[in-house]
Each structure stands twice: as structure tokens, then as C-alpha cells.
Amino acid sequence: MQIELGEETKYLEFDSEHLLSKKPMQIDVLVKNERHVKIQKNIGRIFRQYNIVEYKSPEDDLNIDDFYKVYAYACIYKADTETVDFIPAAELTITFVCYHYPRTMLQKLHRDRQITVENMESGIYYLMGDAIPMQLIIVPRLSKTNNYWLNNLRNDLKSGGEIRNFIEKYGKNKNSKLYQALAEIGRAHV
């Protein structure tokens, strides 16, 4: 490469075997779905067979670099298999779960990649115009009835009614390992 570029190499820096990340790359959550099952729950309707989910904490904003990092993870997940095209691109989705509407990121995606946003229902937005289906879930905008648990996974539950209601609903399921994990996450955010 350097020889081919000749005189222009003085303007370039070459870094062979460049490490892409200082820490191991990991996906927040990978949701695998059986191919023939169409998910009916509103947050999972977009799901295909392999679904990459990125969570942002209530304190964090979703920015353009987060978008590209997760998009790259989806591409690496698709490509890093034993056989070529083992994971078809058509079977991938990306879900971003956050607490603040990422207006700046979405404006940049529209400007640079012509990706548009379609509001599917309260708190659920599809990012249209890319080969990989993507959705954006804004937790505080979700329906409090349809998405009770996700909506209450935050650090600003109001004392009294909200907390009492959460504890009552949790109490009915406290023996479930999933609900115990949810309570642990809730404690970590308080």
C-alpha cells in the first residue's frame, strides 16, 4: 500500500494490525428468536432472528458515535461466524433503548444517510431507510400500561403511589429469577 501511494505517503500514517477497541467488544443484550415466531409485544414486533439491543442509562444520551458502535457490533456479529453468511443480514435488527430523545443523532442520520424516523406508537420509533431494521425506544414515552416494567426501570420513581405499585407487582412475582434480576437493576439505579 505504501509503495503504491508513492510520494503521497508523507501525508499518511500507516498503523498495521490496529486494535479497534481498548476493551473487549460486547453487545448489551442479544435476543435470539425462533425463525417462525412473530413477536406480538410492541417492543418486539420489529424482531427477526438475531436482535441486538443497546441500553443507555437514564443519565446517558444516545449520540451518533453510540449509533455507529452498535451498528458495527451488529455487522461484526453477522460476519464473525464459522461459515459464510450463516447469519443472513435480513435476520438482524438493532434496538436502542434510552431515556432521552436523541434529536441531534437523528438529525445527523437523516442528513448523512437519509434515515428517517417513524413514530410507531408511544415511545417506539422505527428508523427507516437502512438495510438493517432499527428501532428506538424512549422509555419515559412508553405506555405505562403496555410497558409497565420497562417504564419503571428508572431512578426517579415517585415515592408513594409509583413505588408502592411497583413493590406490589414485584411481590406477586418475587420468586421469579427474572423479576429478582429486575429488582437488582432497579437497586443499582437508585
Where are these regions (language model features)?
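Elongated, amphipathic alpha-helical interaction scaffolds
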Residues: 1-189
